[in-house]
Amino acid sequence: KMELILPCLYSELKGDALPKIVSEIAQTNYLHHIIIGLDQANEKQARKAWTFFEKLETPFTILWNDGPNLKKLDKELQKKALAPNEKGKGRNVWYCIGMSIARNSARSVALHDCDIKTYDRRMLAKLFYPVVNPLFNFEFCKGYYPRVADNKMNGRVSRLLVLSLIHI
C-alpha cells in the first residue's frame, strides 16, 4: 500500500503548480491514501482546501496545522520536548509522517513538494518504483526534478551545486 505526503501552504492552492499536481495525481490508480499537510490557513481556508482536494480519486486526510486539534497536540508534545521548534515545511512533514505512522497501513510512503510547475504523474511513479519493486533492495529514494524557468536553472541543485562550482 502506497501513501503520499503533500506538505503545502494554503497559498499554493491558487498557484500554478498545485492544481496541476492534483490533476495529475487524480489520474493515478495505485495510491492507497494521501496525507496533505496544510499550513498558513484559517478555518474558512481549510474548508476551501478540502473542496480543492476532493478532485483526488484517492482517499485523503488533511492535517490542518493551524487548526485547534494540531495546536493542542503540538502544545502537549512541546511540554515533552517532542515537537518541532519552528513552524515551516519540516514541522509540516513531521506531523504528516506521524499521521502515516498512526494510520499504520502504508508499506511505502512518498513525499514531494507542491510547487513543482513541471509536474507529471510519472515523477510520482519514479519516486515509488525503487522502493516498491521487490527486485530492488531499497528502503529510501530521493528524487530530483529540474527547476528551469526563463532560460535559467533554479532550485536547490542549482544553488548548492552549480553556483558553488562556478565560484571555485
Where is each model-derived feature located?
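Conserved donor-nucleotide/metal-binding helix-loop-beta segment in metal-dependent transferases, i.e.
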Residues: 119-142
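N-proximal low-complexity "stem/linker" segments adjacent to membrane-targeting elements
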Residues: 1-26
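Short beta-strand-to-loop element that shapes/binds the nucleotide-sugar donor at the catalytic cleft/hinge
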Residues: 137-156
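Short acidic, S/G/P-rich loop/turn micro-motifs used as interaction or catalytic elements
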Residues: 9-14, 41-43, 116-119, 147-150
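Short beta-strand/loop segment that forms part of the nucleotide-sugar
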Residues: 31-42, 63-65
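Short beta-strand-to-loop acidic/aromatic patch adjacent to the donor-nucleotide binding site
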Residues: 105-117
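Active-site-proximal specificity loops/subdomain of glycosyltransferases
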Residues: 45-104
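Conserved small/polar residues in nucleotide/adenosyl-binding loops
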Residues: 166-168
